[in-house]
Amino acid sequence: MLLHIPGLFDADEISRIREALEQADWADGKVTAGYQSAKAKHNLQLPEGHALAKEIGSALIDRLWCNPQFMSAALPHKVFPPLINCYREGGNFGFHIDNALRQPKGSPERIRTDLSSTLFLNDPDSYDGGELVIQDTFGVQQVKLAAGDMVLYPGTSLHKVNPVTRGARYAAFFWTQSLVREDSQRTLLFEMDNAIRQLTADVPEHPSLLQLTGTYHNLLRRWAEV
């Protein structure tokens, strides 16, 4: 499942974030890549624990916990603290699959990367190239969203970032460990939850709603890991 979640940050917030990022001190993005991924990774990144990265990440996570789309699709259990990257002219990241497990710096806890997310932090017309290309059971998708919008997709997906040929591309990225690790099961639950919400709006007194809601929770009970 690939999901577009719009409008997590508004235009004024994005403007302030972009100004801060343009003044930031960046490090080589290879520091958080695995052995194989590092060979394909050519970008910049704010160091883990950087004050600006923590500020943006905290605001993002707070909004996601209140976002019905994210909560329904991801069924989040743990979220890796968001990282911030920058692709300038020539920057790119070849095809790769993210590491299965991630450990936040300074934490003993590991997170299984069931879902990957990218939040775009500048307008798509401010740079050329830089598309996020995701290859999975849904086919090949090229993603280049408006500033403040986020894409959510399976951590098992082969993906890359096309070379930036003009300007700079700023983004936040992170991983989520879901209560339900299997993508097909999460997709089924997401579609079922959406159908229940729509039926509740259209025919709120329909007797089948109780049964459908019960079936949703029984499936979640069967598949969830806590």
Swiss-Prot record:
Instruction: Tell me the superkingdom of the source.
Output: Bacteria
Q: State whether keyword Protein biosynthesis applies.
A: no
- Keyword Oxidoreductase recorded: yes
Which keywords does this chain's UniProt record carry?
Dioxygenase, Iron, Metal-binding, Oxidoreductase, Vitamin C
The note on cofactor binding and number reads: Binds 1 Fe(2+) ion per subunit.
Positions contributing to 2-oxoglutarate binding: 169
Species assigned in the record:
Pseudomonas entomophila (strain L48)
Protein name from the UniProt record: PKHD-type hydroxylase PSEEN1031
